[in-house]
Design a protein with these regions (language model features):
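C-terminal helical subdomain
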Residues: 85, 134-186
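Short alpha-helical patches at coil-to-helix transitions and adjacent helical residues
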Residues: 31-35, 89-90, 152, 156-159, ...
Length: 194
């Protein structure tokens, strides 16, 4: 049995491709892989257990498009694909939390923050700075501090906080960042990421 499952496999901004199962690479890896694994082992989570799905602030790039998850009708855009997969992680978290809370198991989606890892290997360094500039514009509009890279312990902190420290009711079905519940995106207030 498990106390906590942290679903943390992921790729970002990959060239267009498909998984061995035929799904667009990012959606298949970042969302469907977690979805299948977690649902196969969910019964092993003890009462009081938690599921932590690693998502990203990149969920803001796109909603999920279940009519065209493999980009068969729309041009492939790496960050749109990444956003779709990370939004799907959050929506899965909300549904998992609703489905399992009666048995004492809760779920949270976590944005670990920006950290320099192999995750960004497909991104040109000049594009990275453009992304940071865009993030900082959004943060400034929200009255928040500018982006800073995190260390590995800082990156892990929100997963540990949501999985072990925060109250279950505080994090259940919610999106967390910087060891707090994240800001609500108004369009999703009643039916999605909270």
């Amino acid at each position: 049995s498990f106390d906590v499952i942290i679903a943390n496999a992921g790729v970002m901004a990959t060239p267009f491709g498909h998984t061995a199962d035929g799904f667009e690479t990012q959606f298949g890896t970042n969302h469907l892989g977690h979805f299948v694994l977690v649902n196969r082992i969910a019964r092993l989570l003890r009462a009081g257990g938690r599921l932590i799905n690693l998502s990203s602030s990149g969920h803001r790039y796109s909603n999920v498009d279940l009519q065209d998850p493999n980009f068969e009708r729309t041009p492939y855009e790496p960050f749109v694909a990444y956003g779709r997969s990370k939004t799907a992680n959050i929506l899965f978290t909300v549904a998992f939390d609703k489905r399992h809370r009666d048995r004492g198991v809760r779920a949270a989606a976590v944005h670990p923050g920006g950290i320099k890892t192999e995750l960004s290997r497909h991104i040109d360094p000049s594009h990275t700075q453009a992304i940071i500039d865009q993030i900082n514009r959004h943060l400034a509009a929200e009255g928040r501090a500018p982006f800073q890279w995190k260390t590995i312990p800082q990156e892990a902190a929100t997963s540990v906080w949501a999985g072990m420290v925060a109250s279950a009711d505080e994090i259940g079905g919610r999106y967390c960042e910087n060891c707090h519940v994240g800001h609500i995106v108004p369009d999703f207030e009643h039916h999605g990421p909270r």
